[in-house]
A protein has these predicted regions:
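Ankyrin-repeat-protein effector appendages
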Residues: 1-7, 94, 127, 139, ...
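N-terminal segments that cap or nucleate solenoid repeat domains
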Residues: 1-36, 40
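Ankyrin repeat A-helix N-terminal signature
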Residues: 7-12, 40-46, 73-84, 111-117, ...
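Ankyrin repeat structural motif
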Residues: 13-21, 46-54, 80-92, 117-125, ...
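Alpha-helical adaptor scaffolds
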Residues: 65-68, 72-85, 89, 99
Length: 194
């Protein structure tokens, strides 16, 4: 029944997921890569299925073979080229760790920012994501995304760093590679025409 549940989740078949859960399917079923049903639902952005799995006892911070959690999967679906702020919000409400890290010290905020997901970044920051956390290379999220020209994300992160007490002269907000992007793009993002 676990395999059927994973298939139903990946197909975003909410009715079938509910039917299988009611029939005793394990809400923590895993696919061949170690991803749980909840991770797959989060990756697909299916809030209804996420809710059903959580109600059935899915473990919110379970990790796959690479250490990814459902929250990380909801931060960006590379195939759909989008993240899912509503799913991120729900997972956090269920107790997901917003500062969990994987290989190289990558965190959910870094994933969302790296793909230009401003709305997801805002949700994560509102729930305690550490904007000053560094990856294993010593880079903060802002330092990692400055050269990507995600103006909204850069401005969100810059404001969050400022709110965290990092001044304009800090390494993260001014002296890092690509810092000219913040200086150049910040004024543009604030105009009503952009």
């Amino acid at each position: 029944m676990s395999e059927q549940l994973i298939e139903a989740v990946k197909a975003s078949n909410s009715a079938r997921v509910r039917e299988l859960l009611a029939g005793g399917a394990d809400a923590n079923a895993r696919d061949a890569y170690g991803a749980t049903a909840l991770m797959n639902a989060a990756y697909m952005g299916n809030l209804d299925v996420v809710n059903d799995l959580l109600a059935a006892g899915a473990e919110v911070d379970a990790k796959d073979e690479l250490g990814w959690t459902a929250l990380m999967k909801a931060c960006n679906n590379a195939e759909m080229d989008r993240g899912f702020p509503d799913v991120v919000e729900r997972l956090i409400a269920a107790g997901a760790d917003v500062n969990v890290s994987i290989t190289y010290g990558i965190r959910p905020l870094m994933i969302a920012a790296g793909y230009g997901e401003g709305a997801v970044c805002e949700v994560l920051l509102a729930h305690g994501a550490d904007v000053l956390a560094k990856n294993d290379g010593g880079l903060t999220t802002l330092m990692m995304v400055k050269d990507k020209f995600y103006v909204d994300v850069i401005n969100i992160l810059h404001a969050a760093e400022r709110d965290a007490g990092v001044g304009e002269g800090s390494c993260s907000s001014k002296n890092a590679p690509g810092s000219n992007v913040v200086t150049f793009l910040k004024p543009l993002a604030r105009t009503p025409d952009h």
